[in-house]
Amino acid sequence: MDEVANALAVSQTMMEKMQKLEISKNYDVEKFETLLRLPARDVNTFMEKEAKKTDDEKMTDMDRRIKRIREDKTDRAARTLQKYFRKIRVKGEQNHINKRISKIPAKRRVVLLEQIRQKMGEQQPIRRFGGYQVIRAVELHKGKQKLQKDWLAKLSIDVNFHDKNLSRPNSPTHFIANSIPTLIRKKAEMKHAEKMQEIDSSIMDIYCGFQKDNLH
């Protein structure tokens, strides 16, 4: 990559130098033709004005058109290179994933996928999907397990808080305190079930997607 970038930089520098030489040549030719048409008394004034001109002002109309065309070509070339290297990077990532999957024997892969399906509670048969879908399904399953642990920890904290602050014998809040843990659990279970359904739906989308079959 560094060698390619250096080569492109050198090429760009050479192109810019050649363009400046071409602009300078065209300008000198145009200036010479103008001098031939001028009266002798106006030559010095003309030369003084020309000496004050910037590089852009010295460009002819043809030079400006050529410059725009070259800039457009440079932009298109840059986009083409970006697209090419992006394609290489994406292909490399896909190959890396496929290698991770292909290291597992095909029969072992089927067994592992079946175990994942059973643990996630999915009853539909495994359909065609590729290496990316396998890794994504495992990630979702790990996320589901983490969510379950977080939910249980939060539920324990909520219940303990109400037990300590409201469950006092012979107090007016004693009956309410006994009911709160149950209500908390019910509400938390409903929210938890909804979240699990969302994750299961995502996993279903992956399992039911028709992708390139890597199980061969």
Curated annotation (Swiss-Prot):
Protein name, per record: Uncharacterized protein C48B4.3
Organism, scientific name: Caenorhabditis elegans
